[in-house]
Amino acid sequence: GTTEAETNLKIAFKLQNLLEQSGSSVILTRSDENAIYDLDAKTLKQKKISDIHNRVKIGNESSADIFVSIHLNKIPQQQYDGWQTFYNAQNQDGQKLAVAIQNNLNKAIQKENNRVAKSIDNIYIVKHVEIPTTIVECGFLSNADEEKKLLEDEYQNRLAWGIYNGIIDYFYQ
């Protein structure tokens, strides 16, 4: 099947393009499918931890205004679908960002989705990046119908457009 990393990157590149066209500077934590772990990380677990720590470091040292982390869900149950944003309850601006993106994804995708932006405290990036941060789960690869959509260029464009409009709303609200 398709890797989550590959699809996330396609959506991120589309979002980067939209943001740069409107005059924003964009910093990606990676520009290919390779994780950004330290070379001394040996085991898969060490590599994952190192990768996440390096993303947090980029977020905190970048002088960026916001941090948006794009993901796809994959769980054993196949019935779940839809997108959802997450934020740190201790960061009000992170919450505003997550809500703005959630609402704009709802408009861009135009599909029934009752999920709302949700606070989450056990995700390292959300806890440790100091600027307003949101995780955007764009959908479920474990749902066959949604996986098909997530691989379509047009659907990825709509996801990027929803995230983009959420970011714009965040800065102008």
What are these regions (language model features)?
Residues T2-Q173:
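Active-site-proximal helix/loop segments of hydrolytic enzymes
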